[in-house]
């Protein structure tokens, strides 16, 4: 059975995917309804011929959305923090073309921080895991904006469009499996934990007026039992190893 006919002739042929009027569903560019049947893939690594074959196979199975995992930053030791991986961007460009021709839309995940932080990035805590840093470290935040801009604004030689202007690119995933409420926060290095403590203390003081007033407003349920017991005396909130 070949379900290719269920997909559009070319994805994005009617414009960008958008939300319905009630914001509960997706619709095509012409306003018609669309439901996504999706898979995740690393096919940007394939040869051009295999990309075409892969997308044709997915369309035959009834798939109309491919989630493409591409970590754009260059995390190899020796790279600058602003460096991007040109081969990854080039592979994504070619895959997007293959997807378009088979009626597949693309969801792109450009940042998956489960890698070792290169010393050459000159970020506090280098040599350790990168999880959580996007929420804490200003240098990583600035670099993230640069990586993302590079990926979405470079012209795709196969389509003549930048990714940001290509209706085949339906959904942008800004972050993948990373959070200060995720288990990886337990692996923050001491320098980054100190930065997090400083950020949190500034927020508490802005909200309550002082560290003491923040402490007074926090209730009594866990006082004497957690890592914030030193707020009144230290004047700061210390984020320990089990935040």
Which residues does each PLM region occupy?
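Active-site mouth of glycoside hydrolases
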Residues: 10-243
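Non-catalytic propeptide/linker segments at domain boundaries
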Residues: 1-13
């Amino acid at each position: 059975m070949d379900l290719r006919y269920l997909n559009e002739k070319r994805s994005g042929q009617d414009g960008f995917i958008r939300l319905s009027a009630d914001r509960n569903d997706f619709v095509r560019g012409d306003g018609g309804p669309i439901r996504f049947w999706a898979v995740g893939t690393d096919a940007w690594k394939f040869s051009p011929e295999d990309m075409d074959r892969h997308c044709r196979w997915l369309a035959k199975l009834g798939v109309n959305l491919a989630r493409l995992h591409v970590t754009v930053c260059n995390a190899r030791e020796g790279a600058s923090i602003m460096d991007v991986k040109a081969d990854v961007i080039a592979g994504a460009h070619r895959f997007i073309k293959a997807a378009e021709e088979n009626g597949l839309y693309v969801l792109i995940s450009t940042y998956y921080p489960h890698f070792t932080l290169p010393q050459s990035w000159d970020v506090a805590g280098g040599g350790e895991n990168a999880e959580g840093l996007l929420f804490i470290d200003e240098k990583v935040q600035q670099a993230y904006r640069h990586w993302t801009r590079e990926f979405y604004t470079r012209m795709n030689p196969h389509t003549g469009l930048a990714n940001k202007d290509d209706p085949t690119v339906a959904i942008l995933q800004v972050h993948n499996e990373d959070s200060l409420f995720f288990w990886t926060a337990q692996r923050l290095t001491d320098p980054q934990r100190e930065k997090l403590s400083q950020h949190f203390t500034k927020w508490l003081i802005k909200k309550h007026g002082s560290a003491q007033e923040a402490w007074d407003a926090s209730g009594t349920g866990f006082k004497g039992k957690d890592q914030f017991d030193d707020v009144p005396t230290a004047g700061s909130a210390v984020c320990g190893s089990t935040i």
